[in-house]
């Protein structure tokens, strides 16, 4: 993965980034849980149960890999979360302007 | 797997065996679906969602391997189904007595 060349991270930025990270993670899990419960309650065919199983397998794999909090990649993770609506642009204002711009630009790719 | 040495299978036995097989399979799937729906509706923690995922993975694997309808193994499969309560002894009366006895004996192992 490309390294970002933004300004060094302050301690406040790092702490707030981790807090927002956890928030997005919780939102994702809450959403997944709601989706699974809604889908499970509507299943009548076994094929749909296996489809739900496939969906869960894929999501678990995706979520396991997604929340990488190494500082070298966190800009990319936030861009992805912004793209997916798990983080809102207004929540990124604790970051220096160059980081916010970079995240927004990446999210549009 | 051991071969069974019971009397040859009549056409009627084979047909009824396959019908009972499908019935047991449907019972298993119905039971699994009910279990998953009940569990899913009670989940509040993500760990429990992953546990449900693990449970489904194991069940899918088990069910995929279990309903082996080759005549050489069907006695063993019925023994397993009997043991698990997916087939009742009274449902096996279409089979010659030696086959019923063998299934019941294997189910007690």
Swiss-Prot record, chains A, B:
Membrane topology type: Peripheral membrane protein
Keywords from the UniProt entry: Membrane, Thylakoid
Annotated consequence of substituting residue 54 to E: About 75% conversion of OCP-R to OCP-O
Cross-referenced Pfam families: FRP (PF18032)
Induction: Transcribed from its own promoter, it may also be cotranscribed with upstream ocp.
Gene Ontology CC terms, in alphabetical order: plasma membrane-derived thylakoid membrane
InterPro entries in the record: Fluoresc_Recovery_Reg, FRP
Mutagenesis / variant outcome for changing residue 60 to K/L: Almost no conversion of OCP-R to OCP-O
Chief localization: membrane
Cellular compartments annotated: Cellular thylakoid membrane
Effect of residue 50 to L: About 25% conversion of OCP-R to OCP-O
Effect of a null allele: Decreased fluorescence recovery after non-photochemical quenching (NPQ).
Function statement: Destabilizes orange carotenoid protein-R form (OCP-R), the FRP-OCP interaction accelerates the OCP-R to OCP-O conversion. Increases fluorescence recovery following non-photochemical quenching (NPQ) by OCP, most probably by destabilizing OCP-R binding to the phycobilisome core.
Subunit note: Probably a dimer, interacts with the C-terminal domain of OCP-R.
Entry protein name: Fluorescence recovery protein
The organism of origin for this protein: Synechocystis sp. (strain ATCC 27184 / PCC 6803 / Kazusa)
Gene name, Swiss-Prot/TrEMBL: frp
């Amino acid at each position: 993965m490309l390294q970002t060349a933004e300004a060094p991270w302050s301690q406040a930025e790092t702490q707030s980034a981790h807090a927002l990270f956890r928030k997005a993670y919780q939102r994702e899990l809450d959403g997944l849980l709601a989706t699974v419960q809604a889908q499970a309650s509507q299943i009548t065919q076994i094929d749909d149960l296996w489809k739900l199983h496939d969906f869960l397998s894929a999501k678990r794999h995706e979520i396991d890999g997604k929340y990488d909090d190494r500082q070298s990649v966190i800009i990319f993770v936030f861009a992805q979360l912004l793209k997916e609506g798990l983080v809102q642009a207004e929540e990124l204002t604790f970051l220096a302007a160059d980081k916010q711009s970079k995240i927004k630009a990446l999210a549009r790719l």
